[in-house]
Amino acid sequence: MEKTISAIATPQGAGGIGIIRISGDRALSVADAVFHAVSKAKLSELPGMRALYGTVVDRKGTVIDEAVALVFRAPHSYTAEDVVELQCHGGSAVLRRVLARTYEGGAAPAERGEFTKRAFLNGRLDLTQAAAVMDV
């Protein structure tokens, strides 16, 4: 897949934690542009299956929200691509701002079902599994 995509991965409504998922070749660089780890580590330098605590910032460096970033390296992710999940506060205003920041960082809006489509096209799911996910 050429484009890197992002979307809110949690249901809308009242929830304490919300997740923004980023997937594609540039997922780590998009996340590095918007997430600053307290440890100063770059997500792009981490091996997979790692988490860092930090903040999501706007272009000026102003904090939007605190977050935990989880890195899943290809092919060991749902989509078989590099994936970053930004877990922040679950309010809709915060999630919209964090999502908008990922777009500014270079991600494109994901179409409905696009993460599952990528998982299918990349061999992570068979047709029956993909159809079952889409039915949920």
PLM ranges: what are they?
Residues 1-136:
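A glycine-rich (often HGG/GG-containing) alpha/beta subdomain
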